């Protein structure tokens, strides 16, 4: 019965049995073949002149255009891994690296808020400048008016002072007090100048009753060239 099915035909004929296939090696070979097929589809194949890897036979579900892909609305779409899968991977990576929508909205709101704050600060600065300029002009105007009023009041006070009785005596007393104050100040080299202030050097003065021209000339010379000690 076994002979009828031919199970032991190879052993009886003396031919060596085929070695058992390694599952790990077969899996690695299949993966390398698939990777090579993807690279060839995306344009990353070997350069011209090199031997391309043999294409893996696909499932034979039909003949003609059915082996190449699926036709939808007159367009043929590739069912195997091709450029569409590569673009999808890139789009997925972009979605992963893209900022979340909440953070993007927060950044946009912060940018608009900073722009509004900058514009408001510029407007406020301009208003402060105009206000400061106006205040300075008003202060200068008030100061000028106050100075003019002080001048007028001083003139009126001086006129009233000299019109009051005994104004000469009051003025003489004030001059005497100023002279005493200056005389108490000890400044080297001004002694004869202080002495000359006590004399009347007007030759037409009616108060003089004696000839003091000689003494006057001596005092003038001492005032101009004091004696050296």
From Swiss-Prot:
The modification Phosphothreonine is found at residue 187. Residues 1-82 are annotated as: Disordered. It is a peripheral membrane protein. Residues 93-155 are annotated as: Involved in binding clathrin heavy chain. Residues 58-73 have a biased composition (Polar residues). The modification Phosphoserine is found at residues 11, 13, 217. Keywords: Acetylation, Calcium, Coated pit, Cytoplasmic vesicle, Disulfide bond, Membrane, Phosphoprotein. InterPro entries: Clathrin_L-chain. One of its GO terms (biological process) is intracellular protein transport. Its main location: membrane. Disulfide bonds join 199-209. PROSITE patterns: CLATHRIN_LIGHT_CHN_1, CLATHRIN_LIGHT_CHN_2. Pfam families: Clathrin_lg_ch (PF01086). The modification N6-acetyllysine is found at residue 204. GO terms for molecular function: clathrin heavy chain binding; peptide binding; structural molecule activity. Belongs to the clathrin light chain family. Clathrin coats are formed from molecules containing 3 heavy chains and 3 light chains. Interacts (via N-terminus) with HIP1. Interacts with HIP1R. This is Clathrin light chain B. It comes from Homo sapiens (Human).
